[in-house]
Amino acid sequence: MASTDSARTLVAIPARWGSTRFPGKPLHLIAGKALVQHVWERCQECREIDDVIIATDDARIAEAAASFGAKAVLTDPDHPSGTDRIAEAAKSFPDHRVVINVQGDEPLISPALIDELARTLRADPAVKMITAAAPIQDAAQISDANVVKVIFDTQGDALYFSRSPLPYVRNPDPWPRSYRHLGIYGFQRSFLFQFVAWPPSRLEQTESLEQLRALENGTRIRVVLTDELSPGVDTPEQAAAIEKHLTGK
């Protein structure tokens, strides 16, 4: 598990104790392991990553991380987002030029997707920020505000993200392919610190989508396409569904 060039790469997994809907979620057991341990183990399978850390606001999560061999960094409990949390944690790793933010509630995240984001950032320092998207297969998701849509240009850079349908379809025959945004981000280290230094932007606050802060400030976001969806865990019921998938029971 190491990058093949001089640009060291860090994966940071934000893990917050105080989820409104699911307190203590990172330590919820799924098939005998904490949720955050599943995410960490998937990241350990990556071939392009030098270090994986868990950025947390709670000593209980840090202690659990140590018990299964993970590095944990305790951060300010009052960060407004996971990106702010990983930015604080990344300060402890000054030799890492690339930082990947892997959501702490996606136990089936694809190691290959993480590697692809890391490779792209290392190969082209002009790409300051990167994320991923997948084709929407269920038409109902196009109008679902909980499914964030993205449109991008011919170079693969995002034009806009929205909870509304993107694009608006005036003539539905044929219906154009729509893409859902996946909540994984990668940053050039220097841009990560620039991003969290900017105040929340107008569109970001309107849509409640922090990636719009980058677009409003004139920064392109590269979008990597994938067919591998990684369901998140927001409720105990979703955790039970993941356990059933993992155990076949």
Predicted regions and their residues:
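Short, high-confidence coil segments that cap the C-terminus of an alpha-helix
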Residues: 49, 95-96, 124-127, 219
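N-terminal glycine-rich phosphate-binding loop and ensuing alpha1 helix
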Residues: 3-55
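Hydrophobic/aromatic residues located in beta-strands of well-ordered beta-sheets
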Residues: 11, 52-54, 99, 129-130, ...
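Short phosphate-binding loop-to-helix
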Residues: 53, 59-119
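Conserved alpha/beta core of the MobA/IspD/sugar-nucleotide pyrophosphorylase nucleotidyltransferase superfamily
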Residues: 2-4, 176-249
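Conserved core of the sugar-phosphate nucleotidyltransferase
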Residues: 109-201
